[in-house]
Amino acid sequence: MFARYEAALVGNDRAVLDELFWNSAHTLRYGFSENHYGHADIRVFRASLPLQSPLRELLRTVITTYGRDFATANVEFRRQGAGNQQIGRQSQTWMRTDEGWRVVAAHVSFIA
C-alpha cells in the first residue's frame, strides 16, 4: 500500500491520495508549514497544490506493523530539482479499515 501511496504522491494522483487517507474528521496531516484536521480539510489543501509534485529520492523507508491492523511508515527523502537537495522526513500511521488500509495521521517536514 505504501508503494501505491508513493506513486500517487509523486504523480500527484489526487484521487488515489484522497482514497488512501481515512475519510474521517479524526484524520490529521501536519505539513511543512500547515496543519490539517479532517479528511475534508486535507482534500481542500491537496486540491490547492500545483499539478506537478516535486521529485524526491527515498533514502530510507521503515515500515513497521503492530498486529494485523495497524502500521507506521517512516521515510527519509531528498528533494530533487534545481539546486534543491533538502532532506525531509515523512511519517504515516496506517490503519486497516473495512475499505482497506488508510492513512489516519501523517507528518512531513524538512531537516533545517
Feature names for model-found ranges:
Residues 87-112:
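Short beta-strand edge/turn micro-motifs at domain boundaries
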Residues 1-12:
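Short, aromatic-enriched amphipathic alpha-helices that serve as compact interaction elements
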Residues 26-37, 47-52:
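A short gly/proline-enriched turn/hairpin at secondary-structure junctions
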Residues 41-84:
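Surface-exposed, charged secondary-structure patches
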Residues 36, 79-80, 109-110:
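Short, surface-exposed beta-strand-loop junctions and turns on beta-sheet-rich folds
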Residues 20-21, 28-30, 70-80, 91-93:
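Short, well-ordered beta-strand segments in beta-rich or mixed alpha/beta enzyme
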Residues 11-26:
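Short, well-ordered alpha-helical segments enriched in acidic and aromatic residues
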